[in-house]
Amino acid sequence: MRIAFVISEHAGGLLPERMGQYHAVERRLAHLARAEVTTVHYSELGAVGADATVLSGSADPWSAHDPTALDDLFGSLRARNEPVLGICAGMQLLARAGGGEVRTASRPAGPGFVNVDALDRSDLLAGLERRVSVWEHHTDEVLPLPMGFRALATSEHCAVEALAADDRRWWGTQFHPEEWNGDHPAGRLILENFLRLAGIPLR
C-alpha cells in the first residue's frame, strides 16, 4: 500500500530547513503505517497513485503560491478517490477545493500546544477526550465551514479546528497531529484514526 505525502509549500519555499520538517512528518507516517510513504510536491500529485494522501502545512502565505498551480491541485484532489487528510494549510487546501474560503485569522495561534474541543468523535477524533491538547501554528483559518463539510473540533481562537467532507472521504485538522509526545499524545491517535479510515494497516 502507498501513502502520498504531499508537500503543500510553493516551489520557492522549499528551503532546506523546511524540507527537514517535512521529512520528519514523512518519518512519523512511516513509523505508524505498514505502507510505503512517497513524498511529492503538490504540483506532482496528479501523476502519483496512492491508497491515502496526506497534505502538509505551508509556511508562506497563499499569496506566494501560483494561482494556476493551486487550481491544478484542486482539480487533482477532486479527481482522486482515496481518503485524504489535510494538515494545517493542507486542511485549508481541502476546504478551498470543496468550494470554501480561507481568510486571515482574527486570533493567530501558536506556535505551541493549545486546547481544542472535539465536536464530533465519530471518525477522525474517535477515542479522544472532549478536550485535547494539540500543537498549532497558523495565521489563516477556514471560515465559514464549506457546504457539504462538518466541523469536528473548535477552539477559543479558531472556529473550525478540524473538518470532514464525507462524500469525498476528506478530513482536515488546522492543528498539527504529527507533533505529538508523551505529554500530548492526541495527535498520534488522530493519525492512527485516519490510517484506519483509509484502510492502511498500522504497525
Region locations from a protein language model:
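Alpha-helical elements of Rossmann-like donor-binding domains used by nucleotide-donor carbohydrate transfer enzymes
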Residues: A24-V25, D72, R150, L189-N193
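Cofactor-binding loop segments of dinucleotide-utilizing enzymes, especially the Rossmann-like FAD-
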Residues: S8, Y42, A89, F175
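Pocket-forming structural segment of enzyme catalytic cores
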Residues: R96-D166, W170-W171, F175-P185
